[in-house]
Amino acid sequence: MSEGGAARTHSGWRHVPPIEPPPTRWVMPSTGPIDDSDIVAVGADLEPGTLLSAYRSGLFPMPFDRRRVAWFSPDPRGVLPLDGVHVSRSLRRSLRRYVVQFDTAFQRVMEACADSRRPGGWINHQFVAAYTQLHELGWAHSVEVFERGGRELVGGLYGVRIDGLFAGESMFHLANDA
């Protein structure tokens, strides 16, 4: 067994029910934005119970300023239906250079997504700590892309799986098509 109770295989994880954290002390607002920025609230914390309550309410967090968190609910929301996805022949060829794994390098993916040299970077150490806690409880997951035959992490993403939804939070790539 590993952190969060997910049994590991050589290529990733098999599903083990996540651990429900204590409930949040915060009341989540309705999903209607207060202005054109898609922000519905500012404040609260990044405790696991708060994050899960927010996701269940259709909200996600981003830093607002140095100390506060803003809660967003964009309308319309980007949704990628996965049934019927077409992967081109050239992309399939390109993907042969890589190995894809799940939940084997969550912290490394978070750190790569949080790299301050990335344009538009917004992930700070509080978010890394908060989502690492969610990962340890079995709610947050990562997809890692390694160069075939090596241990170099060249791409990945992380997000939260909850109630049949995977909410991708951030991703990075250091190589084409990774």
Which residues does each PLM region occupy?
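N-acyltransferase acceptor-side catalytic subdomain
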Residues: 1-178
